[in-house]
From Swiss-Prot:
The keyword Ubl conjugation does not apply. InterPro entries: DUF5313. This is Uncharacterized protein Rv2742A. Its main location: membrane. The keyword Cell membrane applies. The lineage of its organism: Bacteria, Bacillati, Actinomycetota, Actinomycetes, Mycobacteriales. It is a multi-pass membrane protein. Keywords: Cell membrane, Membrane, Transmembrane, Transmembrane helix. It is found in: Cell membrane. GO terms for cellular component: plasma membrane. The chain crosses the membrane at residues 49-69, 71-91.
Length: 134
């Protein structure tokens, strides 16, 4: 059995509410942990921010005009959405981990595992880092 088969998933209504800040039941903590700290979490969060922006901007494309006018109407609004979703990604994921009573440091877990060999090589070459309190 795969991990997804035993991990409870939110229903569509719960998922929509969760995407925009609602808390899921404790039975779904493993799913939340994987969603917010697992592989691809940053991209998932950016997509969740972009979807409402695209839905709001889509009617502008129904106005009969040229492509450059369409782009000049929508891109100045869409680009900041994408920019801020990237800039505030870890902040929002840490907040959502706290909301679900999970450790906010899980956000960096994937990067720590990915870069562990770099830290080991540094310690082997230069020794452990000095304690700043000494």
């Amino acid at each position: 059995m795969s991990d997804n088969a035993i991990r409870p998933r939110p229903n569509p209504w719960q998922y929509i509410r969760y995407c925009y800040g609602a808390r899921l039941p404790d039975s779904m903590r493993d799913w939340v942990r994987n969603d917010l700290a697992g592989k691809g979490a940053a991209i998932r969060m950016m997509i969740r921010v972009a979807v409402p922006a695209v839905l709001v901007l889509a009617p502008f494309w129904l106005i009969p005009t040229s492509l450059d006018v369409h782009l000049s109407m929508t891109l100045p609004i869409l680009i900041p959405f994408v920019y801020f979703s990237h800039a505030l990604n870890k902040v929002w994921r840490r907040h959502m981990l706290r909301v679900h009573n999970l450790d906010p440091e899980l956000v960096d877990e994937h990067a720590r595992q990915r870069d562990a060999h770099i830290h080991r090589a540094y310690i082997e070459r230069y020794g452990p880092r000095p304690d700043p309190n000494d």
